[in-house]
Amino acid sequence: METFSSKDLALQAQKKILSRMASKSMVNMFIDETSSEILDELYRVSKEYTKNKSESQKVIKNLIKIAVKIGVLFRHNRFSPEELVLAQDFKSKLHNGAMTAISFYEVEFTFEKDVLPDILMECKNLLLRLVEKHLTPKSHGRIQHVFNHFADPEMLCQLYDPKGSLWPHLQKICHGLNKLIDEGKL
């Protein structure tokens, strides 16, 4: 069994960002167990689709770094009232995307190839606007990388193919998304 763990990556990202305050409990403030399981499944989807372990690790590592950085900015009240409106718009759009992803999974023959990529691109643009003044161009590149990677229509078509090899991962991802929604975290 492979030793990849999104929690370990989250801890590495947190250590780099928060250097003196890095601890496993601090990572858990940003990435809970359910989110970690979803990230692990996203990694498996990416790895199976791209056949590239290092690229798949990099995209998840970038996702974790961005999530932790935004969490740090939010916890330290770095966002202006206008940016908080953008954050709420992003959260709403992300929630909409999760609900759409779940619906496509639960209701046969409803998957539409262009819908999720469009939602993900809207999320990406909102997030880039939110962090424009707070994060470096390198972090902006990470955001681009993550959203562009998971908005790949061909990957999504394979993911939503009930007879495909990625389908079991989709089941776990949607189960996790449902749990986050039920808990009010997404």
From Swiss-Prot:
UniProt GO BP: innate immune response; regulation of apoptotic process
InterPro entries in the cross-refs: TNFAIP8-like, TNFAIP8_sf
Alphabetized Gene3D superfamilies for the sequence: Tumor necrosis factor alpha-induced protein 8-like
Pfam families: DUF758
Keywords, alphabetical: Immunity, Innate immunity
Domain comment (free text): The central region was initially thought to constitute a DED (death effector) domain. However, 3D-structure data reveal a previously uncharacterized fold that is different from the predicted fold of a DED (death effector) domain. It consists of a large, hydrophobic central cavity that is poised for cofactor binding.
Function of the protein: Acts as a negative regulator of innate and adaptive immunity by maintaining immune homeostasis. Negative regulator of Toll-like receptor and T-cell receptor function. Prevents hyperresponsiveness of the immune system and maintains immune homeostasis. Inhibits jun/ap1 and NF-kappa-B activation. Promotes Fas-induced apoptosis.
Recorded family membership: Belongs to the TNFAIP8 family. TNFAIP8L2 subfamily.
Database matches in PANTHER family: TUMOR NECROSIS FACTOR ALPHA-INDUCED PROTEIN 8-LIKE PROTEIN 2 (PTHR12757:SF4), TUMOR NECROSIS FACTOR INDUCED PROTEIN (PTHR12757)
Record-given protein name: Tumor necrosis factor alpha-induced protein 8-like protein 2
Organism classification: Eukaryota, Metazoa, Chordata, Craniata, Vertebrata
Gene name for this UniProt entry: tnfaip8l2
